[in-house]
């Protein structure tokens, strides 16, 4: 294959250290609070990077365009195909979604982005005045700069939003290169095209209308509505944290962990994947904007923070499972550089990314360790430990600190945050009666969610009672549905001592639900044709009643979680997507249920996590809906190959509170049979 330019992807040049240490990619909020000079350089460097001539090979525009539109070869890989004509060949695009190469392909892609951003940061640092030591300070800070990540699954710092203000604010304060503090257009909020179509037809008519990237754009004006994101992330945070914890601590096979393609042999415990969770964040943060469409998502600055976090989660998982890597599989579709049916393996070239020699393309085997590109993460500083065992124990400790050790500990931490943007008031310390904070009360009034508040008071009051005596079954009194007006989560309000985490692995008031440290864990599995609707859509899962207006679904109290399907139209220029569509590619995802069931238990609506109690409860209360890219409801039974099922497995919690999953799953068609697209006894999982 001929190429015009062999652009070597090196990542950031990193001098070797005596102990193998490399600089860290840091969480965005950590970078902003604890490394202010690097954060300032990040903003200024990104601003300049985004301002580069769009014709420049390593410009922001060109690098983002590798991921989808404008569907042109990058660095001449290949150089002899006219991609302006969608029908000129069967190929299209480099990206490898729903394939075994999904997470490995994105690593050199991120290294290219980081390489270009780093160069911009270094140039900015040199522009500061020498006087007062300002230049020296910023040059020193720039040396170890690495691209940050946004950890969307961890609890936000107290008193802050689930979606950081640094990402949602249209302007932001910086110390500019003249040494003066000023307000600039926030380069983390949007990328402004200059112009939107450097070459005629680079973007479709639908995307050409936007001069800048947008999130949840207003249907009439096209204005970005970033304020929608924080309450949506907050409302489904418990499900998201449980999903990440499940993936990192339960999944042991790389193929199952990494990507979302479904086949008839998929185990009920393997419907989830890192790609599935990745899709959810694209959907939750983009709505009907750029992030929710893979063809244009890389132009949104959030894309890079999101994907660095995906890369981080892979690094964590890979170091916990060093002996598990990809199994060779046939390519499910054709791309610019791969024929359908060709074997994809750890030796498959990750085109268009040339290695450091510029003689060969990177392969998955070569990029397995992030240190290859000169970076690590706070959790993967392996050089600090004397043995693999000690290192892995430290990783697990970090995972449990960020995402919870087990579902019971997670529940105590998440119970007051699962509802939209802290509509649930939290109880105060040692008082015998719960009180509502002014902020939470205001949010409740704004959302009209007084019954939600009453229910959460009951959650705290019931917990100790249920530890002492059996629950008397009561009529379902699910909280009335509501929408969120407030966004603040994690306020510094003490929970009652009865529901705080105890030194043991399971909180005292919940131990009766896991005799001998064992309990039944529940999940909802969803599968559907990826491109069956010709657009992105989401399957939203509820446990209880909800408002029939789809505009409210993201904020519903009884919304448990979602599976997001990032589909494309049959007319897309993306060759692989056309192939996927023609072949009826099916993808899958998982929504954890156990945390929501625990809330119903302490709320007096469910007796235990045992099948004899959960089956009728789910049969009566489990519901799901489909919403399209623009938020409109879509008829469930018209979604090709949509199937929803419920499964469970036994989990044992060890003395340190870590869950050990049996991986033997039972499927319950009696829960979903007869419901629209519900799994029945004769259906294939």
Curated annotation (Swiss-Prot):
<dbReference type="InterPro" id="IPR041640">
    <property type="entry name" value="Tyrosinase_C"/>
</dbReference>
<keyword id="KW-0186">Copper</keyword>
<dbReference type="InterPro" id="IPR050316">
    <property type="entry name" value="Tyrosinase/Hemocyanin"/>
</dbReference>
<feature type="binding site">
    <location>
        <position position="67"/>
    </location>
    <ligand>
        <name>Cu cation A</name>
    </ligand>
</feature>
<keyword id="KW-0883">Thioether bond</keyword>
<dbReference type="GO" id="GO:0046872">
    <property type="term" value="F:metal ion binding"/>
</dbReference>
<keyword id="KW-0560">Oxidoreductase</keyword>
<dbReference type="InterPro" id="IPR016216">
    <property type="entry name" value="Monophenol_mOase_fun"/>
</dbReference>
<keyword id="KW-0470">Melanin biosynthesis</keyword>
<feature type="cross-link" description="2'-(S-cysteinyl)-histidine (Cys-His)">
    <location>
        <begin position="95"/>
        <end position="97"/>
    </location>
</feature>
<comment type="similarity">
    <text>Belongs to the tyrosinase family.</text>
</comment>
<feature type="binding site">
    <location>
        <position position="307"/>
    </location>
    <ligand>
        <name>Cu cation B</name>
    </ligand>
</feature>
<keyword id="KW-0503">Monooxygenase</keyword>
<keyword id="KW-0007">Acetylation</keyword>
<feature type="modified residue" description="N-acetylserine">
    <location>
        <position position="2"/>
    </location>
</feature>
<comment type="function">
    <text>This is a copper-containing oxidase that functions in the formation of pigments such as melanins and other polyphenolic compounds.</text>
</comment>
<dbReference type="Pfam" id="PF00264">
    <property type="entry name" value="Tyrosinase"/>
</dbReference>
<feature type="binding site">
    <location>
        <position position="278"/>
    </location>
    <ligand>
        <name>Cu cation B</name>
    </ligand>
</feature>
<dbReference type="Pfam" id="PF18132">
    <property type="entry name" value="Tyrosinase_C"/>
</dbReference>
<feature type="binding site">
    <location>
        <position position="106"/>
    </location>
    <ligand>
        <name>Cu cation A</name>
    </ligand>
</feature>
<dbReference type="InterPro" id="IPR008922">
    <property type="entry name" value="Di-copper_centre_dom_sf"/>
</dbReference>
<dbReference type="GO" id="GO:0004503">
    <property type="term" value="F:tyrosinase activity"/>
</dbReference>
<feature type="binding site">
    <location>
        <position position="282"/>
    </location>
    <ligand>
        <name>Cu cation B</name>
    </ligand>
</feature>
<protein>
    <recommendedName>
        <fullName>Tyrosinase</fullName>
        <ecNumber>1.14.18.1</ecNumber>
    </recommendedName>
</protein>
<feature type="propeptide" description="Could be involved in enzyme activation">
    <location>
        <begin position="409"/>
        <end position="685"/>
    </location>
</feature>
<feature type="binding site">
    <location>
        <position position="97"/>
    </location>
    <ligand>
        <name>Cu cation A</name>
    </ligand>
</feature>
<keyword id="KW-0479">Metal-binding</keyword>
<dbReference type="InterPro" id="IPR002227">
    <property type="entry name" value="Tyrosinase_Cu-bd"/>
</dbReference>
<dbReference type="GO" id="GO:0042438">
    <property type="term" value="P:melanin biosynthetic process"/>
</dbReference>
């Amino acid at each position: 294959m001929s190429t015009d330019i062999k652009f070597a992807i090196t990542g950031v040049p990193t001098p070797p250290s005596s102990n193998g240490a490399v600089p860290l990619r840091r969480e965005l909020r950590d970078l902003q609070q604890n490394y202010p000079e690097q954060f300032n350089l990040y903003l200024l460097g990104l601003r300049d990077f985004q301002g580069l001539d769009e014709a420049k090979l390593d410009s922001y525009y060109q690098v983002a365009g590798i991921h989808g539109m404008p569907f042109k070869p990058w660095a001449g890989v290949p150089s002899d195909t006219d991609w302006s004509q969608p029908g000129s060949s069967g190929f299209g695009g480099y990206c490898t979604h729903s394939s075994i190469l999904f997470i490995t392909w994105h690593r050199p892609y991120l290294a290219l982005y980081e390489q270009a951003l780093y160069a911009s940061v270094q140039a900015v640092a040199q522009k500061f005045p020498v006087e007062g030591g300002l230049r020296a300070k910023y040059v020193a800070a720039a040396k170890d700069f690495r691209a940050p990540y946004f950890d969307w699954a961890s609890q936000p710092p107290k008193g802050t939003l689930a979606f950081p203000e640094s990402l949602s604010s249209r302007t932001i304060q910086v110390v500019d290169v003249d040494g003066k503090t000023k307000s600039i257009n926030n380069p983390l909020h949007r990328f402004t095209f200059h112009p939107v179509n450097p070459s005629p037809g680079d973007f479709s008519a639908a995307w050409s209308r936007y001069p800048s990237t947008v999130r949840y754009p207003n249907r009439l004006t096209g204005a970005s509505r970033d304020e929608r994101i924080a309450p949506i992330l907050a409302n489904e945070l418990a499900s998201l944290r449980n999903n990440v914890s499940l993936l990192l601590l339960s999944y042991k096979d790389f193929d199952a962990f990494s990507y979302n393609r479904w086949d008839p042999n998929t185990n009920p415990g393997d419907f989830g994947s890192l790609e599935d969770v990745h899709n959810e964040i694209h959907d939750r943060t983009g709505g009907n904007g750029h992030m929710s469409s893979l063809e244009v998502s890389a132009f949104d600055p959030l894309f890079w923070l999101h994907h660095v976090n995906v890369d981080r989660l892979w690094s964590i998982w890979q170091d916990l499972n060093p002996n598990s890597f990809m199994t060779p599989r046939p390519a499910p579709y054709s791309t610019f550089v791969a024929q359908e049916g060709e074997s994809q393996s750890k030796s498959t070239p990750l085109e268009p990314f040339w290695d450091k020699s510029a003689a060969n393309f990177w392969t998955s085997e070569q990029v397995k360790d992030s240190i290859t590109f000169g970076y690590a993460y706070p959790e993967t500083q392996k050089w600090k430990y004397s043995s693999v065992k000690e290192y892995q124990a430290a990783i697990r400790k970090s995972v449990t600190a960020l995402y919870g050790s087990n579902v019971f500990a997670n529940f105590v931490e998440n119970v007051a945050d699962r509802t939209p943007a802290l509509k649930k008031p939290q109880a105060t310390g040692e008082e015998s009666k719960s009180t509502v904070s002014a902020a939470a009360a205001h949010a409740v009034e704004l959302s009209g969610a007084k019954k939600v508040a009453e229910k959460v008071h009951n959650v705290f009051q019931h917990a100790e009672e249920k530890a002492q005596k059996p629950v008397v079954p009561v009529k379902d009194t699910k909280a009335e549905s509501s929408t969120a007006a407030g966004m603040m989560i994690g306020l510094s309000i003490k929970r009652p001592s009865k529901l705080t985490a105890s030194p043991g692995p399971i909180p005292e008031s919940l131990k009766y639900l896991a005799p001998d440290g064992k309990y039944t864990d529940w999940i909802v599995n969803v599968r559907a044709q990826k491109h069956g609707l010709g657009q992105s859509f989401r399957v939203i899962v509820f446990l209880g009643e909800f408002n029939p207006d789809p505009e409210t679904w993201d904020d519903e109290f009884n919304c448990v979680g979602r599976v997001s399907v990032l589909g494309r139209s049959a007319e897309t220029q993306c060759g692989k997507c056309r192939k996927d569509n023609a072949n009826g590619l099916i993808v899958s995802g998982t929504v954890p249920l156990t945390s929501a069931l625990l809330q119903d238990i302490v709320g007096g609506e469910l007796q235990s996590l045992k099948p004899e109690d959960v089956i009728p409860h789910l049969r009566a209360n489990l519901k799901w809906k489909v919403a399209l890219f623009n938020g409109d409801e879509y008829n469930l039974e018209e979604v090709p190959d949509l199937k929803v099922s419920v499964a469970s497995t036994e989990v044992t919690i060890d003395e340190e509170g870590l869950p050990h999953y049996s991986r033997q799953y039972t499927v319950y068609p009696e829960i979903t049979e007869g419901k629209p697209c519900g799994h029945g006894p004769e259906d294939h999982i």
